């Protein structure tokens, strides 16, 4: 395994497209009226959060939705910077390219980024291989997020979740109320009429806000193309070392991944439709190296955007249950 990782690192540039390569291929186009309406709604929501809450924060998970959300936030408050910090809950198992991209974007934009790692999880050595996906996700993501929100006293957390991603998210409000214990009750949601939002909170309560609620996966990709938004190169097809495990193509991103008997990493042309912790995120065979090709693949697909997320397969890990416990 070490040999193939060393080989990949040594020749990484020609295998995976760089941000400069990708930007050079993107032709700027005018946004459609549909995208303009979505953009206007999202910017209105972001400004509403800044006006109504004492200490908001924006979750930055480095994926395509977070990249669109960050771009919208920069637009909403231009020529100034967003009046709230960004927060990344780092599980320590993200793809290396994701962390490199995160740090590069923060340097380019000069933004305030808070990176939180659950110290209890680190002390216990919690990881997806040693403890399983369910416990890893709960400790390093859900509990880590709650720790960060409480430590900094944030009363509103902005995220990039969309209603078309998953059925429990489809029924969640744009302004989603959370109890003092960060719990979401799907049976106790507030009405949202037109663009009027109830932002009132009792002491200790908080709000999760989703400005991209009404966007679809296609909308996100169209907007990325039109606005030339930088995204992690992992979304584009390239030769990457993968093993087939439990029906998923798992990328061997570093030497921490233990190989099972008979497993040998193979370089295959793959990309990722969604991003998370690398041991829990399956790749898809692909030759799509442009945004147009990605959209074509997506339109031809009959599978869920989150099909590669191993955490969604846990019998006790439904999205609604995780959200009720404080997951974003």
Swiss-Prot record:
Enzyme Commission number(s) of this protein: 2.7.7.4
Catalytic activity, reaction form: sulfate + ATP + H(+) = adenosine 5'-phosphosulfate + diphosphate
InterPro entries listed in its UniProt record: PAPS_reduct_dom (IPR002500), Rossmann-like_a/b/a_fold (IPR014729), SO4_adenylTrfase_ssu (IPR011784), Sulfate_adenylyltrnsfr_sub2 (IPR050128)
Region named Disordered: 305-328
Residues in the signal sequence: none
UniProt pathway: Sulfur metabolism; hydrogen sulfide biosynthesis; sulfite from sulfate: step 1/3
Family under the similarity heading: Belongs to the PAPS reductase family. CysD subfamily.
Function: With CysN forms the ATP sulfurylase (ATPS) that catalyzes the adenylation of sulfate producing adenosine 5'-phosphosulfate (APS) and diphosphate, the first enzymatic step in sulfur assimilation pathway. APS synthesis involves the formation of a high-energy phosphoric-sulfuric acid anhydride bond driven by GTP hydrolysis by CysN coupled to ATP hydrolysis by CysD.
UniProt name for this protein: Sulfate adenylyltransferase subunit 2
Species of origin: Rhodopseudomonas palustris (strain BisB18)
Gene designation: cysD
